Each structure stands twice: as C-alpha cells, then as structure tokens.
Amino acid sequence: MIYQSTLNKPLTISGIGLHTGRQITMILRPAEPDNGIIFHCTDGERRVSIPAVSANVVDTRLATVIGKDGLSVSTIEHLMAALSACGIDNLHIDIDGPEVPVMDGSAAPFVALLQETGNRVQEKRRKYLAIRKPITLVDGEKRVSIIPSRFFRITFDIAFDHPCIGLQHRAIKVNTETFRKEIAPARTFGFLHEVEYLKANGLALGGSLDNAVVIGEEGVLNPDGVRFEDECVRHKILDAVGDFSLLGHRVLGHVKAYKAGHDINHQMVEKILANADCWQLVESGEAASHGSLSMTGCAAMAMAGVAEA
C-alpha cells in the first residue's frame, strides 16, 4: 500500500487487564493522516493524550508501558503489533483503564477485529524507516542487531532451561498474512512460580490459562497445550513487532535477536533513533521501487510474493 490508512469506522474492544484484572474498554477511532497512533487516557479528572512512540516509553520490565504527565498505558505491544501488521497508520484510542486488554494473550483477536472493521486509505503517502548501516546492541546474554533489508524481517532465538521451551528459533518476513497466520496466535507465556509471585505482589491479577501459556515443573498446564511447538519464540517475535512499531514508522530492515525482551527492544529502538546516519526515511513510492511493500497491511498481501534480492 502506497498511502497511509486508518480504520473505516470506530471499533470498540473490551476485555480483562492482565495485571489489574479490571474490565477495560477501548474505542479505536479513525484519525487524520500523519496523526500516528495516540492513546487517550483519563484518571477521572483529566484527559492525557500519549502518542505511541519510543520517547513516551516509561517502563519495560513486564510489558511495554507508555506514559505522560503522570498517566500511563501498559501492555500496548500486542495491539501495536496488530495495528502495524494490518496497515493502520493513524488512530485515536480512548481507553478507560491503565492497560490494554490482554484478550487471549495473543494478537489474534485484535487482528480479527481490525480486519473485520477494515481500513480506509488516506491521501498521504506512507514513509518507511530504511536501515542503511548495521546497528548492534548487547546487554549481557541479550543481543539485538538490525541490518539493511528490502523488507521487514525478524530472526529470533531464545534459550530457556526448561524442556518445554529449550532452544527455539524462528525467522520470518513480516507482512499481514505471515503475521496473521504464524505470529498473531502465539500467546504470552510464563512459568507457574513467576505467576504465583506476581499475583502475591498484586500483579497478573487477570492472568489465567485463558490468556497465557503457563509452564509448570512437569510441563504446560493449559488443557489444550500449545498452539505451535515453538509458540514461545513466535510470541517473542510478536512482542518485537509491537516494540519496533514505536519507531513511529514501519521498518525496512532485518532484526536479529537472541534472548531479547521489551527492555533491550526499547534500547535498540532508542539506539536506532539516536544514530540517524544509519537509516533514512523513504516515501512509499521509493520503497515500492525496491520491492518493500510486503509490510504494509491488508491491501498489500498480493505483494508478499515479490522476490527479495
């Protein structure tokens, strides 16, 4: 898709917050070109608008949290990943709680609702952040790098000392169709002892086997098991798509990550923005000339077969 897009019409989404356990409602409203994604939250007395960009990230310990003027919205990464993959550039999001609903722990419900609502193409051309030089970030065992690519690609490796996870590897060229089929259904995951600790400390109050893969000493506790043998690494890719969307533009680059999470993802986004000599903003017409439209949403599915050099 050459041009920016927003939703066809308002979309209301309700669900439980993972950490608060509260019922939360969001109203996603169409926005003008170049608006970006903006969350509007309230504490009952005032309304604060928080653009979903890296500069507004205030916490990455358990999820990606954006905030401004003392108010914040947590766990935005699954929704942001779905918006990016479905080609939504501009949106107002009214939210009546401190976190995005967890839904089933994946991005699949968001993708289904967005595709049912549909996109409205706008008159402004879309811009891409095209990586021109490699950038690498290392934090202990965690590593993230990004190198030039004509598409948005993610290669991810994780390593856990548990037989249910162990070593997992997945590489993907991210577009609407691959995201919908291979990444969006992957749920957040955690170990039983971690969940118990969080709940004892007033967190993960909305967490359950209905919205997370929970792993005990003997294996996965969910009655239906996992959706993919490598569901955990797929979910890490989902998180990365959401976290890298906070660059404010779709990426043309190949992300390679090892043991990465929200913290180092955010650090990498900040490092990219700080090294302006390593990237260039290009308009969609120029990106299309390089065969780069496979990232751009529902109308771009037909481009997914374009060969990459």
UniProtKB/Swiss-Prot annotation:
Binding locations of Zn(2+): 78, 235, 239
Entry GO MF terms: metal ion binding; UDP-3-O-acyl-N-acetylglucosamine deacetylase activity
Catalytic reaction annotation: a UDP-3-O-[(3R)-3-hydroxyacyl]-N-acetyl-alpha-D-glucosamine + H2O = a UDP-3-O-[(3R)-3-hydroxyacyl]-alpha-D-glucosamine + acetate
UniProtKB keywords: Hydrolase, Lipid A biosynthesis, Lipid biosynthesis, Lipid metabolism, Metal-binding, Zinc
Species name: Syntrophotalea carbinolica (strain DSM 2380 / NBRC 103641 / GraBd1)
Cross-referenced SUPFAM superfamilies: Ribosomal protein S5 domain 2-like (SSF54211)
EC number per UniProt: 3.5.1.108
Name the record gives this protein: UDP-3-O-acyl-N-acetylglucosamine deacetylase
Gene3D superfamilies xref list: lpxc deacetylase, domain 1, lpxc deacetylase, domain 2
Stated role: Catalyzes the hydrolysis of UDP-3-O-myristoyl-N-acetylglucosamine to form UDP-3-O-myristoylglucosamine and acetate, the committed step in lipid A biosynthesis.
HAMAP family the record matches: LpxC
Top EC class of this enzyme: hydrolase
